[in-house]
Amino acid sequence: MKEQTKEKITLESLGEFGLIKHLTKSIKLKNKSSLKGVGDDAAVLDFGKKKALVTTDILLEGIHFDLTYMPLRHLGYKAAMVNFSDICAMNGTPTQLLITIGVSKRFALEQIEEIYAGIYMACEQYNVDVVGGDTTSSLTGLTLSITCLGEADENKIVYRSGAKVNDLVCVTGDLGAAYMGLQLLEREKMVFQGQKDPEFQPDFAGKEYILERQLKPEARKDIIENLAKAKIVPTAMMDVSDGLSSELLHICNQSGVGCRIYEEKQILEKAQKCTQLPHQPVS
């Protein structure tokens, strides 16, 4: 018996408000600071005695991600996570999220559901409420913009400008894995596009770690929680998204100090020392 292919639902058939209703129908608020979420002209939040933190990131198809190898669910997860990371870098806790998405007619409802599934997965894991957003049509590919709100006690907020002479420079994880994962994906994409064999599959064996660091990064909320338990407030902090040297330059410039880094002291996992690619994690 021939299996029937389920017909995909077009976004045009739903319309903007139908799409929003469909994507947000299962949202339940978890944070006390979320008084009103999706369904009104604006969200209503109450942070009480804490200070509100706000950050936003926009991801453009062809600039920040390539759908040739980026699964849509991973894209949604990563879009949320890069915003959570900014809040954590201020020594805060992410609490609310707003999602703005621009899509073209080439996307079906099921594909948009995959993006939102990734976002909701990230929010569930980090106890963040989706409280609003917007949808629109796009003529230039997929656009995904996330705004994240968080909270922190005023005396525990950590800025880039607080570094002092004789401070110790620390990195919470290893370096270079996400970049090496990107290089591997780009290499395999080129090989795949040059193949005539329809059965050809990219070779990612043994490279799962660096691929996950690129496609499914994690915000270091665990570090913020551990610092709080130890009653430690860093003098300066920021997330490393563009590389160690550029982020240190930001901190040094804003703090009016210099720094010295010892390459042999940096933590590098074996998975990042990939001899198949002409790069080094810290070069």
Question: Which role fits each region the language model picked out?
Answer:
Residues 1-283:
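Helix-biased detector of long, well-ordered alpha-helical tracts
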